[in-house]
Every structure is written in C-alpha cells, then in structure tokens.
Regions:
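ASCE P-loop NTPase motor core, strongest for the SF2 helicase catalytic module
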Residues: 165-398, 404-525
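Charged, low-complexity
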Residues: 2-16, 21-220, 247, 251, ...
Length: 525
C-alpha cells in the first residue's frame, strides 16, 4: 500500500464530506446542503482528476443550472412607478420563488426539483436586493407588474445601473425625471431676480436642488454647514413659489415654518430683510389667539411658529393644505415618539423640507424620523428599519447595508461643508441672530424699566448729573436682565431668551464639529 498517496487522496476528499466512518473507511455527507453544492458544482470534477468516481442515477441527475435572463421594465405613470419583472426562461411563479429565496451569503438557490441555481455574479442577486429593499413579497412578485412609490425612482436607477446581466427598459417619463434629478445645475429653473445678485454660487445651486425636489414631488434635507446660508436658500424657494402662485401657475396656498422658539422672530426678520414682499405671520400668544391667527391667515402667507406651540395647535393646522412646510433644526424631531415629532408629521404640505447643520447619516434613528416626516414609508416602519438596517450597521458594521441605505437617501440630502465652497466665501461670515424677550423675563425687564423712568422723571437737572453713576448702574441692570435675569437675581429660575438661543447655537455648532470661542461682557453667564 502507498500510505502517502492514500493520505493525499484522503485530504482531497475530506473537505466535501462532514462525517467519516473509521471502521468502514467511508466518508459521509449528511444534512449539509452547502457541502453538497460544493461537491456537485466543482468537487466531482476536481476529484475525477485523481480517481474513478461511481455515482447513483439520482445523484447524477443533480445539476447546477445558470440563472435565467431577466428583463425589468420601469415606467413613471403619474406619481407612481410601474415595475415589470419578466423572464422568457421561467414562469412568474418560479421567478418569484427564486427572488424570495435569495440569500446574498450563499452562492446558490436550491430549486424545488433539487437542482442548484448558481447565483454568483449575476443579475439575479441585484434584483433580489432590489426586491428586499422595496419590500416586495413573493405574492407581489407573482403578479409580474408591481406598483411602487415614485420616491423609489432614483434608488432603482442607481441599483440597476450598468448591470449587463439584466435587460432594463425605462419609459421616457422615467428617464426624463431621473435626468432632471441628476443634472440639477443645468435645469431651467431661475433664481428669483431680486435675490440673484445676493446669493453665492453654491446657494444658487441649493435653490436649484430645492426647486427640483419641489417640482418632482420629493422631500429633502438641506444639511449645509452652519453659516452657509440655509435660510436664504429657503427664502429663495418661498419667493419663487409666491411668484408662481401670483402668475396662476400654482394654487394659492399658505406655507409653514417650524423652528425652535428662539428662532421664530429671527426667521421673520430674515424674510423681511431679503424678501419684504413675502407676508409673514407669527403664530404666538394664548391658545385662542393662536387658533384665531391660524384660521384668519390668508392663502399665500407664511406662518412661523415654534415646535412647542405647533404640537399644541396641530389639530388647527390639520385643516389646511400648505404649499411648503419647513422644519428648522430638524434634530428637534429625532425622537419619533415625542409630541413635537408627531405634530410636524400631521401637517399636510405639497413639499416638505428639513434643515439641519449637523451630519445625520451616522445617527440612524434620527435619520429615520426625519424621513418619516418628509416621505412617510420611505425608510419603512421604524421596527423594520431598526431590525434590518440600523442594528446590522451599528452592531455588525454591515458595509453592504450601509451602502444600500446611502443609495436610497443620497438624492434627498444636500450637505456642503465650508471647505467645499471656500472660493465662494468671504473672509469672515457675520450673522446677527435676534432673541425676543418673553414671559417672566419680559415682565422683569418692563418692571425695572418702568422704575427707572419714574426715578428719572422725578429728578431735576442737578440731581440727574449728580446721580449719573446710579443711572449707569440701572442701565447695567437692564442689560443684565436682557442677557439672563440670573445675573441680577440669584433666585431666578425662569427662561432666558438670549441664553437659550446661545446654548442652541453652541450645541448645534459642537454637533457639527466646530470649536467655539465665546465672548460676553458678563462672564458670570
């Protein structure tokens, strides 16, 4: 016996079998489909180079077959996509079965007759991923013609692009919309004339992006770095919308801006500054006052309110259909279970936009909540999203899942950093942010201001000059009350408009990776 040769042959055979009967010197392959596939797909051929192999008829009938040629038709009809999946080599039922059984971790699919279908490097794997991402069930696939939301168009175009093993047919409406989304800078939309000389090049591109989303019926996230002028880009869109409504090209409707309370009046000032022809309405005051303001607002006006007030007034807003709804500092709805998040999602609007200065792709639960506001269902239910996308990415660092998620969301997020647009920026960007006193802080300021006026009214000229230091002291107290009443009153625990706004700016800046240098005449703040 040639023991060395026997050992060599044994080592060649062993990888294809999972049991070895020592007493009978027999290898056994038992209950292991993966090893059976390896044996049938290439193992027998390799072993046959060294030995004579005898098989039963049943075993000889096991085959490894190639994937069928599949054609995919995509049509845009109104606001829906029609998807047709077809193969001349098998029935719809068989094709649906294959797609439902696809597992990207495997190299094959076991057919009902026992044969193996090779799915390595073929169009079927791409189609199966699309089927999974679109949540197409085997029952859906058996129909042959599928209806999916229009917002899947860019994903489908990217997922099926350049796949030589799939035959893709697209109707002209679908190709036209995709072309518009991909060539935004070449679009025919025009920046409003009054703003054209004010806006920087990247801001004009931002307007074109917003306008393209608006006209195609998609929502979006404008996530430019802090200081790059997201507000001005939104104002340009609101201006264009108003011009089209006045020209009769669009139905006359209100728009709605929702932001932190500290930014409500800042939004009004910025709109008045850049587009004074736009009519803004602040929704504030008591519950009856706010309801009256909303109900008596006119079509074409821009309502501005805070997250806190909107969640209380959501029922009143639900009676209207808005042209544009903007949520500023969109991280306010990062927790979908909060009343603020539920409130903004109850509003009906033709176009929904979210603004944020911080990157959101790495905070997946926040990303889901924002897209649930923009285009409900786009990222499925949160339970499905968490199980199938968030946890695999966060826990297992699943690169394939991350790439597929990016492919879905990429067309609907625009983020430019300062480093990306340096040539368009001045040496220094200055921005004035206005804080409006309210509530207890305003009452304290009014009380101290009234007391000072009474004191001054009772002084003659001589007393006035003699008491100048006291007057300066009283003026300092008023300034302290404006900054934060806690500077003057140790037991004050109420709100401070300027401190609250300052903290929001700091939190957002730090969240975007910026460093902060803070100056104040009252360092005890």
């Amino acid at each position: 016996r040639d023991l060395a040769e026997e050992l060599r042959i044994k080592n060649l055979v062993e990888p294809y079998f999972n049991e070895y009967a020592l007493s009978q010197t027999v290898f056994v392959l038992k209950n292991n489909e993966e090893m059976l596939y390896q044996l049938v797909s290439g193992g027998l051929r390799r072993l046959g180079e060294f030995m004579t192999i005898y098989t039963t008829e049943n075993f000889r009938n096991l085959k490894v077959v190639s994937s069928p040629a599949v054609s995919v038709g995509i049509s845009l009809k109104s606001d829906l996509l029609e998807l047709k999946i077809h193969s001349d080599e098998m029935s719809r039922e068989e094709l649906a079965y294959l797609l439902s059984k696809y597992d990207r971790k495997k190299k094959y699919i076991r057919l009902k007759n026992g044969d193996f279908l090779n799915i390595e490097e073929d169009g079927l794997s791409t189609l199966a991923e699309v089927s999974e991402d679109l949540r197409l069930t085997e029952t859906n696939l058996k129909k042959g013609t599928l209806i999916v939301p229009k917002y899947r168009a860019m994903y489908l175009d990217a997922a099926l692009k350049n796949n030589q093993l799939l035959s893709i047919e697209k109707n002209k409406e679908f190709k036209g919309m995709v072309r518009n989304m991909k060539t935004i800078e070449d679009s025919d939309y025009e920046v409003p004339e009054a703003l054209n000389s004010i806006m920087r090049s990247y801001q004009k591109n931002g307007f074109l992006w917003l306008k393209t989303l608006r006209e195609n019926g998609f929502g979006g996230i404008l996530a430019d770095d802090m200081g790059l002028g997201k507000t001005l880009q939104v104002i340009s869109l609101l201006t264009a919308e108003q011009q089209e409504m006045q020209a009769g090209e669009k139905e006359l409707r209100r728009s709605l801006i929702v932001c932190p309370a500290s930014l409500v009046y800042n939004w009004q000032k910025e709109i008045t500054r850049f587009a004074p022809q736009l009519k803004t309405v602040i929704v504030a005051g008591s519950v009856p006052d706010r309801a009256s303001i909303i109900r008596h607002s006119k079509e074409g006006e821009i309502l501005i309110t805070s997250y806190d007030l909107l969640k209380r007034d959501a029922e009143v807003y639900q009676k209207f259909v808005f042209a544009i709804q903007v949520i500023d500092e969109a991280q306010y709805i990062k927790n979908p279970s909060t009343q603020a998040a539920k409130g903004v999602k109850k509003i009906t609007a033709a176009f929904k936009l979210a603004l944020t200065g911080t990157p959101i792709e790495n905070r997946l639960s926040e990303l889901w909540s924002i897209f649930d506001y923009l285009m409900p269902g786009f990222l499925y239910t949160y339970q499905k999203f968490r199980e199938e996308i968030e946890l695999p990415i966060a826990v297992n660092q699943d690169a394939n899942k991350m790439e597929r998620l990016q492919r879905m969301i990429r067309p609907f997020i625009l983020r430019r950093l300062k480093g990306d647009v340096l040539k368009d920026l001045p040496e220094k960007i200055e921005e004035n942010v206005f804080a409006r006193l309210d509530g207890e802080q305003m009452q304290l300021y009014d009380a101290y201001a009234t007391r000072m006026k009474e004191m001054l009214s009772q002084q003659n000229e001589k007393e006035f000059h003699k008491g100048r230091m006291q007057i300066l002291s009283e003026l300092t107290k008023l300034r302290q009350l404006c900054c934060d009443p806690g500077l003057l009153l140790e037991d004050y625990h109420g709100e401070s408009a300027k401190t609250d706004m300052c903290m929001e700016l700091i939190v957002n800046a730090v969240g975007a990776g910026h460093k902060i240098l803070l100056f104040s005449q009252f360092t005890s703040m």
